[in-house]
């Protein structure tokens, strides 16, 4: 469907449809990594996959792209967990972070010894002064690494 909108491959040409059907939703999830919005997309995809497709209904109109919606939701939730993003607010899934917050009058947080946050960005980064610079840098680096792979 996505490849045919651009151009139908000629005889003896490789059809990139299989590659595109996986890479397009995955790269969408990398760009749109948010757990809440991904869950909404995932639930819409599940609904359209399970809904009866009577002629003239919305489910029949969305039927060609229902699996794309489902996969875009799955990958968006996955990347949202990696980015630790839930409606642009960090999630404290594993209790405290690996940083000790400073006492009054100090601007420097100190790392707890031998502490690694289990998955995703440490939520303390969302309270840092350079939050936007750091988080956008991490997202760009992840997108570049995954895009090259």
Residue ranges and their predicted role:
Residues 1-149:
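Conserved, carboxylate-rich catalytic/transport cores that coordinate ions
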């Amino acid at each position: 469907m996505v490849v045919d909108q651009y151009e139908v491959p000629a005889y003896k040409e490789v059809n990139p449809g299989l590659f595109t059907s996986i890479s397009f939703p995955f790269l969408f999830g990398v760009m749109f990594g948010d757990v809440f919005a991904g869950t909404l997309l995932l639930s819409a995809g599940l609904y359209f996959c399970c809904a009866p497709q009577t002629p003239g209904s919305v489910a029949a109109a969305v039927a060609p792209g229902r699996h794309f919606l489902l996969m875009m939701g799955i990958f968006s939730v996955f990347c949202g967990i990696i980015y630790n993003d839930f409606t642009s607010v960090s999630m404290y899934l594993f209790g405290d972070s690996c940083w000790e917050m400073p006492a009054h009058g100090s601007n420097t947080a100190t790392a707890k010894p031998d502490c690694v946050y289990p998955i995703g960005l440490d939520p303390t980064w969302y309270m840092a002064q350079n939050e936007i610079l750091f988080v956008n840098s991490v997202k760009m680096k992840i997108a570049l690494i995954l895009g090259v792979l």
